Amino acid sequence: MRKNPLVLGVSASVETNVGRIAQIIGPVLDVSFPPGNMPNIYNSLIVKGQGTAGQEIQVTCEVQQLLGNHKVRAVAMSATDGLTRGMRVIDTGAPLSVPVGGATLGRIFNVLGEPVDNLGPVDAGITSPIHRPAPAFTELDTKLSIFETGIKVVDLLAPYRRGGKIGLFGGAGVGKTVLIMELINNIAKAHGGVSVFGGVGERTREGNDLYMEMKESGVIDEQKISESKVALVYGQMNEPPGARMRVGLTALTMAEYFRDVNEQDVLLFIDNIFRFVQAGSEVSALLGRMPSAVGYQPTLSTEMGSLQERITSTKKGSITSIQAVYVPADDLTDPAPATTFAHSDATTVLSRGLAAKGIYPAVDPLDSTSTMLQPWIVGEEHYETAQGVKQTLQRYKELQDIIAIPGLDELSEEDRLIVARARKIERFLSQPFFVAEVFTGSPGKYVGLMETIRGFQMILSGELDGLIEQSFYLVGNIDEATAKAINSSMES
């Protein structure tokens, strides 16, 4: 932690070590330095000069390789348009540092920690380097407690751990960003602490939507910006790979300060962690490394581990991280999602099949898992209900082939009852979201854990066998489903 260095983490002793650009290949620069003055790996370099059109240029880069012959190879954090060979490059003598603390709340930053929301400069007295070691084993906290989300399928079948890492896995267009926005809506509002959102390589429109949503809900207070509850850090799809690779670390550094110095419980949302891997793959290729499986960087596990191991709970405070993970071609065995799986305490897997049926959130109840779903953590009642739901859905899945060809009539009475209950459960796992009210036309619903357990117990026990399955679709608690069934029977 450093007090009052210049913006962008440039050390106060500027221009003590100056090099020259020797080669430019897209976002990668080779820089020559005087003998004996080589910058360290991860040092921040600043290119200053005038472009061909006379415009002022200032590009920040990060040292990635020491090449020999007094040259280093660095990756640019912004566009390299207008750079030419021979331009002066200043070694700042330290890694990239970003503003941290209360001054970051309510503001939007880029990877360099510069505000990009047109609300003026950030008055941050303290900056922190984005590269730092993970907390030591002796500092870690191992308390186990559930993080209630108000989303039925999550709370019942794959509950989240307070201070844990949660992965939202899904292919393109199955609802990852909507789910993460609903979690922000449900948790960040109810959660008294602060949140940090890292937009890593996703759509700029979604970043803008989220900002507007937070202003409307009061999570960001424009009138009293210091009373806001969230800091936003964006490195979107149009940014160079260097920015997309490091923006997750910028967001994490801000979250770590709230945990370690302010001793708060922090929520860290990352959308999308796959883009972090993808940017690392692009940078790896540009640096000339031999690709590994499916074209990914050979350092995939190391890069992922260095980010994920910093996201943890210590004796001072906790970081609960919720990360959207894009699954290429819906293949969960792809190295990027497979590597992320290893770090997750809970995995929420989104299914294209359920999305096609119109069941939202399209969370696969059989593929989604959680280390918290143990009777000694969640209690016997919760555990037994969750297992009953999974067994019913698993049996329904096994019977699909028989239903598809000979039909329901070929099933035994017991199996027909299981199918009917499974279809009710499947529909009852859907839920109207607050952030999707404009699409569904239904007001959003927050369902408490005890209400969720009671509803599924009633379906499993057979109390609601007489109700039509459609009455369970897109409702909150079980009382709404029974009221909907009574209304539809009266209308018919």
Swiss-Prot record:
Gene: atpB
Family to which this protein belongs: Belongs to the ATPase alpha/beta chains family.
UniProt binding sites for ATP: 170-177
Keyword Magnesium: no
Protein name per Swiss-Prot or TrEMBL: ATP synthase subunit beta, chloroplastic
Organism: Pinus thunbergii
Annotated compartments: Plastid, Chloroplast thylakoid membrane
Subunit structure, interactors included: F-type ATPases have 2 components, CF(1) - the catalytic core - and CF(0) - the membrane proton channel. CF(1) has five subunits: alpha(3), beta(3), gamma(1), delta(1), epsilon(1). CF(0) has four main subunits: a(1), b(1), b'(1) and c(9-12).
Function: Produces ATP from ADP in the presence of a proton gradient across the membrane. The catalytic sites are hosted primarily by the beta subunits.
Organism superkingdom: Eukaryota
Membrane topology of the entry: Peripheral membrane protein
Catalyzed reactions per annotation: ATP + H2O + 4 H(+)(in) = ADP + phosphate + 5 H(+)(out)
One Gene Ontology cellular component annotation held by this UniProt entry: mitochondrion
GO term, biological process aspect, one: proton motive force-driven mitochondrial ATP synthesis
Its EC number(s): 7.1.2.2
InterPro entries on file: AAA+_ATPase, ATP-synt_VA_C, ATP_synth_F1_bsu, ATPase_a/bsu_AS, ATPase_alpha/beta_chains, ATPase_F1/V1/A1_a/bsu_N, ATPase_F1/V1/A1_a/bsu_N_sf, ATPase_F1/V1/A1_a/bsu_nucl-bd
Keywords noted in UniProt: ATP synthesis, ATP-binding, CF(1), Chloroplast, Hydrogen ion transport, Ion transport, Membrane, Nucleotide-binding, Plastid, Thylakoid, Translocase, Transport
GO molecular function list: ATP binding; ATP hydrolysis activity; proton-transporting ATP synthase activity, rotational mechanism
Signal peptide per UniProt: none
